[in-house]
Amino acid sequence: MRFPVGLTLISALIMTAIMVVIGLFVVQPPRPLLVRVENSLDTISPNADGVDDLTQFRYEISRNAFVSLVFIRQADKREFYFRKDERRSAGEYNVLFSGVVDGYLLPNETLQGDILRRLIPSGEYEWVLSVRAQDDDETMEQRGKLTVMGDEIPLPPQMIEFTVSPPIFTPNQDGIDDRVLINVYLDKDATLDVYLIDQNGQRLPISRREESRLSGEAGRHSFDYEGGVDIDADPPDDGMYTIVAEARDPIGQASKREAQLTIKDGGKPRAEIVGQPNGATVVFVTAPYDASYASSMNAIGALIPMPNNPNDANLLPITMRIGDLLVFSLTVENYGITPIRTSGPPPGTVYDQRQLAASLGQYEQSGVWRVGIQCETSEVSYPWRWAIGSPDELVAITDPTNDNTYYYLPAGKRAVVWGAIRMTDLIPTANPQACWAGLIHEDVNVYNSDVGRREIELVPSE
C-alpha cells in the first residue's frame, strides 16, 4: 500500500518539530524563575570605616519579575525592606547592601517629616530574596543569614524647620507673590535637595541661595523659586503642587518634608506698543498749556483730552513754543496669557518738563508696566510715565492680606495711552532734540524702547 505524498510530508514535519522540542529540552532545559542567589558576606559592620561595610548580593532571574529583598530580625521577626516589588527584566544583577533599608522608627522615637532610608539595627537577620513573575505570578525565593554589627542607630538628618512662603504663588512678574522662599534648617551635615513635583510627576529642582552656610552644612539654607520666568520660560500650569525637601547623610540615611504650593495666574507677561500699518505708531502733537493741568505730589491736575484728529498721525518733525505741551498717544496690547499690572498716573496726566513720576507720588514698583516718554535732554530714563489704560479699562483686584488694590490690563486686551509734557527748557546745543516712547516693565526690562522717535524743536514764545 502506498501512502499519499502529502500525508508523508506532513508526518515528517510533525516528527521533525517533536524532535526539535525534545532536543531543546535536552540541550537547554527550562530554567527556574530565580536561577541563583549569592551573598558575599555573612557579617557586616556598616560604620563607614572601610572594613566589611557592605555585602554584595548577586542574583539571576530567567523572566521579567518583581523582586523583593527583606531582612527579618530574628529577635522579634520585624521586617526591614531593602527592595520591595521592584520591576526587573530577565538577567543577572549585582546589588551592594550597606545596611541602609526603607525608613522606620524605633519605639519612643519621633522625627519631623518622613524617614526615607535608615541604617538597619544591629542583630541577627534572615534575608529573603523573593521574585514574582510578571507574566503568570509564579513565585520563588531564597533565604540566608546575615549578622549586622554596630553601635546605636542614629536618626537620619532632620529638617527641624521647613517653611514655604507664600503658599499661593503667582509667577507672572507683577511684583506680587512672584517668588517662593523655602527655608530649611538641618540639624546636622547632609546633602539637601529641594524640588517641585509637577502634574506629570516630574521633579523640577529649586536652586539654593548662596548665603553664609556652605552646601551640605548643618544650619539654615534658603531656596528661591520663581517658576522659570526669570529665564524667559513659562511657569508650570495653574494648580496644586508639592514642594519636597530631602536630606541625606554620608551613610545614605535620608528624610524628607513636604508642603503644598498653589500656582495661580501664572504666565510670562507679554505686551508691546502696537505698530500702526499707516502713519505714526506714536502720535506727537502740540497743545497750549493751561494752569488747570498742573499736577503735584498732592493731586493730579485736569487730564488733557486724547488726540483724535486723523491728521495727527503724520510723521513730520514738531516745532513748538517754549511752555506749550508736547502731547503723545499710542496703543499697548497685552498679547500674553496673563494679566499685566499697571499703576498711575492715569492717561491724560500732564507733566512739567522738570517733574518725574515720583514728583507726582508715582514711584517705581517692581513688576508694574507703564508707558514712558524720554527725550535726548532727559537726565534719567523715561522720566515721564503713565498707566497702561484708564481705570474703566482695567481690572481691580484687592489683596485680602493687606487691603491693597492692584490694577491689571487683562490678557488679549488693548489700551490707548496718552499724556503730555510741558516743554519749558530750551538747550541751544540740543535743539532740535529727539523724543520717543518706551514700554517699561519696572525692575524687569524695557521691552519696547526708542519707539516713534520724532524730532522736536523749541522756539521762543511770542
Where are these regions (language model features)?
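Short, hydrophobic/aromatic beta-strand segments
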Residues: 67-71, 81, 192-196, 338-375, ...
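Solvent-exposed, conformationally flexible loop/turn segments
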Residues: 90, 218, 319-325, 409-416
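Hydrophobic membrane-insertion alpha-helices, especially the h-region
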Residues: 8-25
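Enriched for extracellular/lumenal, surface-exposed ectodomains of secreted and cell-surface proteins
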Residues: 130-135, 246-248, 405, 437-445
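Asparagine-centered strand-capping/turn motif at beta-strand->loop junctions
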Residues: 331-339
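Terminal connector regions
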Residues: 425-459
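Intrinsically disordered, low-complexity Pro/Gly/Ser/Thr-rich segments with frequent PxxP/GP/PP motifs
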Residues: 383-427
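Short loop/turn motifs at secondary-structure boundaries
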Residues: 26-302, 307-308
